From Swiss-Prot:
Pfam families: Ribosomal_L9_C, Ribosomal_L9_N. It comes from Stenotrophomonas maltophilia (strain K279a). Gene3D superfamilies: Ribosomal protein L9, C-terminal domain, Ribosomal protein L9, N-terminal domain. This is Large ribosomal subunit protein bL9. GO terms for cellular component: ribonucleoprotein complex; ribosome.
Length: 149
């Protein structure tokens, strides 16, 4: 299935690229998410006519992500969770908990932007967490998990 990308897609291509993808990936993810359109002649002509508009939109999204990165750099948040005396958590701290803690601290973050390479945190301690804000914009934030008093 041939598609025209309407924005940069990680590991696939940039704005305006003509890409071949499996039909399910295109039909069920890229097209419904507004990341691509089928590569018909009419869509190609329409894309070329609106190319400047799409590029301006992509620049605005990238600039917004860069602004959010500047606010998040060096930021840290403390999350209190139930824990045993040995420091093991009863449960875990995952991306949703981290996103909610940053949002409560005035730094809006979506759970899908929080990348935990080794899974949820199950012990108290200090962790560095990767935040993926855009295809080209990533930063690291600090999360401190402490035992509830």
């Amino acid at each position: 299935m041939q598609l025209i990308l309407l924005q940069k897609v990680t590991n696939l291509g940039n704005l305006g690229d003509l890409v071949d993808v499996k039909p399910g990936y295109g039909r069920n993810f890229l097209v419904p998410q507004g990341k691509a359109v089928p590569a018909t002649e009419s869509n190609k002509a329409e894309f070329e006519a609106k190319r400047a508009e799409y590029e301006a939109k992509a620049q605005a999204i990238h600039a917004d992500a860069e602004g959010r990165k500047a606010k998040l750099e060096g930021a840290s948040v403390t999350i209190a969770a139930n824990a045993s005396t040995e420091g093991k958590l009863y449960g875990s701290v995952g991306p949703r908990d981290i996103a909610e803690a940053f949002t409560a601290a005035g730094l809006p973050l979506e759970k899908s932007e929080v990348i935990l390479g080794e899974g949820a945190f199950r012990n108290i301690g200090e962790y560095d967490v990767l935040v993926h804000l855009h295809a080209d914009v990533e930063t690291t934030v600090k999360v401190v998990v402490v035992a509830e008093a």
